[in-house]
């Protein structure tokens, strides 16, 4: 952030840019932590990011034995907003996912706010989600 153009900006502009960058980094780190912990807690399931030409599901937990999956958005935010779950209610994305991974049994936004249901979407506190995961220790580690 020692760039000439950056330094030519006013203090409020520089602060806003730094805050935006920091929030983006926190969001990506949170996604990585949730994916890793969920994978470790679900050795019989496939846990991955599912990308589409436009947008993605931040996490899919696919159970091949049940031919079913859960889809997630992971947000480093304390606020609920419809745009945060827009991919979870996208009919085309859901149809493609169900065709490939079976029935979608749950749609969840993991975020830093309170647990609640909104329009069929479960908003779950990410800290509670992580605390409730039962991680199986890896033998020999």
Regions flagged by a language model, labelled:
Residues 1-57, 63:
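Accessory nucleic acid-recognition modules appended to NTPase machines
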Residues 3-8, 73, 83-84, 119-121, ...:
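Short conserved micro-motifs at the rims of enzyme active sites and ligand-binding pockets
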Residues 34, 38, 59-81, 88:
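Conserved catalytic cores of phosphodiester-cleaving nucleases, focusing on short active-site segments
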Residues 44, 101-104:
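Short, high-confidence coil segments that cap the C-terminus of an alpha-helix
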Residues 48, 70, 106-109:
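A structural signal for isolated positions on well-ordered beta-strands in alpha/beta enzyme cores
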Residues 53-58, 107-111:
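Small/polar glycine-rich anion-binding or flexible loop at a beta-alpha turn
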Residues 77, 82-101:
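Short, charged, amphipathic alpha-helix that recurs within catalytic cores of restriction-modification
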Residues 109-141:
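Domain-level recognition of nuclease-like catalytic cores that cleave nucleotide substrates
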């Amino acid at each position: 952030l020692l760039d000439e153009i950056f330094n030519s900006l006013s203090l409020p502009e520089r602060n806003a840019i730094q805050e935006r960058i920091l929030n983006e980094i926190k969001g990506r780190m949170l996604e990585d932590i949730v994916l890793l912990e969920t994978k470790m807690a679900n050795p019989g399931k496939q846990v991955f990011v599912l990308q589409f030409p436009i947008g993605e599901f931040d996490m899919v937990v696919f159970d091949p034995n049940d031919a079913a999956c859960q889809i997630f958005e992971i947000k480093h935010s304390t606020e609920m907003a419809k745009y945060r779950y827009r991919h979870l209610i996208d009919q085309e994305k859901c149809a493609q996912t169900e065709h490939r991974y079976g029935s979608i049994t749950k749609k969840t936004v993991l975020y830093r706010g309170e647990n609640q249901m909104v329009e069929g979407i479960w908003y779950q506190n990410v800290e509670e989600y992580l605390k409730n995961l039962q991680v199986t220790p890896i033998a020999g580690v």
